Amino acid sequence: MNFDLTDDQEMMRDMFARFLDENSSMARVRAAAPGGFDPDLWRGLAEQGALSIRVPEDAGGLGLGLFDATLLMTEAGRTLVSGPLAEALVAARLLAQSGAQPDLLERVLAGDAVVTIALHDIATTPQQWVAGASIAEAVIARRGADVVLVTLAAADQKAERNLADTPIAHIDFTGREGAPLAIASADFDAGVEEWKLLISAGLAGLSKESLRLASAYAGERKQFGQFIGQFQGISHPLADLVCEADGGTMLVWKAILNIADGSKEAGAAVSIAAWWNAIAAARCVAQALHTFGGYGLTTEYDIHLFNLRAKAWPLVYGDPALLLDEAGRRLYAGETASLPPAGDCPIEFDLGEDAAQMTREIDAFFTSQVSDEERSHFHYSWEGFVPTVHKKLADAGLLFPGLPGDLRGKKLSHYAQMAAMDAFEHHGYNNPAANVTQMVALIIHRFGSDELKADVLPRLMQGEAICSLGYSEPGSGSDVFAAQCKATPEGKGWRIDGTKMFTSGANLSSYVLMLCRTNTEVAKHAGLTMFIVPLKAEGVTVQPVYTFQDERTNITFYDNVRIPDSWRLGEVDGGVKTMSASLELEHGGGFGKYMRKMLDAGVAACRQISRNGKPLIEQQQAQARLARTAAHLWLAELITFRAQWVIAEKKANLAYGPMAKMFSSEKFLTDARDLLDLTAPDSLSLRPGPTAELNLFYRHAQGATIYGGTSEVHRSMIAERNLGLPRTRA
């Protein structure tokens, strides 16, 4: 797995960034209006090699890949470059491919002439808006099965005021022959697909910069005596959107990798990247402008320039919703697409051979060792705990793949650990019982007494006992540091009194990991201590609490419960340090595997259900909504991959784990609702089959945004650690 650029790509990106910071400043962008073209900037880009980046070397270009071109476009988007760069890059490659008019190509690469493209077939759309046509010498266009170069007259090059002062023009191609180019129509179509990715990259760069400007302003502007970035009404929407902006870049990368690998998803990936970035850019700039308040509406502040370009750049193609329709047809109606040459792509989402081996080992276990009767009890919650399967996994050495080698006896790479978790989820048995017990085993190993290590730890490791967590309390919820359950020294041990809420699995577990208040005279986070408490101890009461997710949790009461001091974990009042040991098991996880199964159920339901005499899967609105769910799934997986990659490779981590959890849980919930709507009223049924599965996923998704840290907590972490906003929590 890799999310890093090559050294050469880093150097190239930095070169373009420095050049554009100086030559596409906001002052230069403003000066280029109303025509929207900066000829000096354009010639400078040519000198930097930007215009020749996709032209083969034997035609005088750099011969670089599509990925390299998107790096340029990301910087161009960040600086609102004044000129039809995405269109010119595609036109230059097509002109070079045709071998026609080498003199014109030479002037294009030198920045002395502009050639652009018409995005729609002029045989069926003879009149259309063309980006860059107000300053271009010629337009490359498709006319049915032919590709032609149409020279523009002075009368065509008529600058026209438009939404964002970009150099577009409305061209009537009726009756214009144009010079034939030796290019197949499929090659031209591939150029349009390339344009979609280039403009997507530009929009992603624009989106990130608009959020950066908004965050910087929110960190210096004060209202009511506080920086406005401390208000969650400001910081939380920005946290949502940085996930969408980052996701836009990753969708572009996925599409390029899919093209390079020949994936059947490649065409749909292009459409989804273009749709997503068009929508996300509009959302990002709108929220960024809102952050500036009334000042954002004035022309004195640069944010309005981002707002206008975010809409203008993609709309030259048409309604972005059509791109989602296109993705739906490519995913579910067999529509194919001509795709451009990708070139080298450094990004890789494969986990490697050791991870593949771990997956095969777990697959073999579930195939040979798990009976149908055992499998029938599987469930995403604690209710799916099957003691016999748990014990067999322990005997096979597969129960706790996330534990470090010094405890487990066999060191696994982080990627193999990830693959194991994914494989369990694939088989429906990534059970909370094992995950929580794994965490408790690690804490005992690190902080437990000799007695705990001798008596409790072996039982956990051998699959003979499981543990639950006693963190939350009725009055504190996610604020674990507000715990009031007391542990009072008594003789050579402790007396525990209090209540814990959402002690899931306490009815099944032998032990509970307790966070207790041991000191009320210090800061609340400093007066906590960790204990292991046997749930069969006298004074412990477990009372069920049922949720509408088909899941049981518990409220547990501790009345004069006595344990020896040897069952304490770590130092007295050192509970926070003890709890931090569990961070070694942080996987930056999300809900991608559940989302994938939910999408599969949605597709299956749409194949079964008919509306107006036609299967739902054949209807455009159904295809588009399934495609939107697929987009959210792909992004959830990509954001999670990045979170896991930075952990494995020890890279800078800008709250990537919280981003993965928050984004995936929120989209899991919205898509679960939408798929129920799409398949209604059949989706009301709990008959065995895909609609029953959609019901279950809808119930499951309700809690996804709550447990493991609420979305609100994660949004605050993202705002602070990724966007640099002031701390919003006490």
Can you name each region flagged by the protein language model?
Residues S25-G36, S215, Q223-Q226, V242-W276, ...:
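C-terminal helix-coil-helix/basic helical segment that borders enzyme active sites and/or dimer interfaces
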Residues N2-M12, A50, G77-R78, K158-D246, ...:
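Glycine-rich beta->alpha junctions and the first turn(s) of the following alpha-helix
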Residues C485-T488:
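A structural signal for short hydrophobic beta-strand segments in well-ordered beta-sheet cores
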Residues G83-G99, P432-E451, G477:
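N-terminal glycine-rich flavin-associated loop
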Residues A118, T125-N162, I168, D497-T541:
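A short core secondary-structure module
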Residues N2, F16, L71, V90, ...:
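Glycine-rich phosphate/cofactor-binding loops in nucleotide/flavin-utilizing enzymes
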Residues M1-S82, E326-A434, D455, R459, ...:
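Amphipathic, small/basic residue-rich leader segments at the start of a protein or domain
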Residues A110-A123, A141-R142, G463-Y471:
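A short, Trp-centered hydrophobic/proline-enriched beta-strand micro-motif
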